[in-house]
């Protein structure tokens, strides 16, 4: 097999820097990581200094993604020799067991880590990930709630809990989690969009109004958010057709829906898709606009 350095005329420093970039950007093209990482380890280990150990870890995780347990085990053995007793290396052992679906073995490792260090967030999160992988969502929810009592600022955990509640159709609790995220991330359009989707799913005029407002805010923060634009359209349409809505509310929401539909039409025209796709999409939007005109009349 040809070497990466020969194929692309790059130096070992280039490959080292590329591995660093992939780590920092959470790049998940695992086959590339293995290819570049293995060449660095096999051909340039003496030049890498302490960087060699993070590359071993990076290659190991990529190997687990690709089902290459032989490579993963080789990297893990090197890390164990260098860092005997390290909690980080023990967690990597747990990840290998997870990849092999040996969940009980992985849980034993994470429990031992937590006995030594109850504040080890990585081990606690892996336990929760195992509950999810096993389909034991109620246990994952319980453990996430316990975790957030101690680490209330962990935004990733709040979002994971929201997703679990959505999967369990517990929309009120999902909305609470998303509100927590909005409070700490008031400029993140995705959280507004997701909160709006939850309120829309809950239904009822009050929730629909909240849904429309949060879709609107998501669009203000990111005017390219097509999902929020469609959300604004559909929530406005449902409010306009709700028998409990006042005449003014209906009129206002027809206006919002008409605006959203016109923006959707513009977006399709600018998207540069194939003519057939564009014509089909535009016909759907024109039907939307025609429906609104009928409603308004």
From Swiss-Prot:
- Where is this chain's protein located in or outside the cell? Endoplasmic reticulum membrane
Q: Family, per the entry?
A: Belongs to the EMC2 family.
Q: How does it assemble?
A: Component of the ER membrane protein complex (EMC).
Alphabetical GO CC annotations of the entry are: cytoplasm; EMC complex; endoplasmic reticulum; endoplasmic reticulum membrane; extrinsic component of endoplasmic reticulum membrane
- From the Swiss-Prot or TrEMBL record, give the protein name: ER membrane protein complex subunit 2-A
Gene3D superfamilies membership: Tetratricopeptide repeat domain
Role summary: Part of the endoplasmic reticulum membrane protein complex (EMC) that enables the energy-independent insertion into endoplasmic reticulum membranes of newly synthesized membrane proteins. Preferentially accommodates proteins with transmembrane domains that are weakly hydrophobic or contain destabilizing features such as charged and aromatic residues. Involved in the cotranslational insertion of multi-pass membrane proteins in which stop-transfer membrane-anchor sequences become ER membrane spanning helices.
What keywords are assigned to this protein?
A: Endoplasmic reticulum, Membrane, Repeat, TPR repeat
Q: Does the keyword Repeat apply?
A: yes
Q: What is the lineage of its organism?
A: Eukaryota, Metazoa, Chordata, Craniata, Vertebrata
Topology relative to the membrane, per the entry?
Peripheral membrane protein
Q: Which organism is it from?
A: Xenopus laevis
A GO biological process held by the record: protein insertion into ER membrane by stop-transfer membrane-anchor sequence
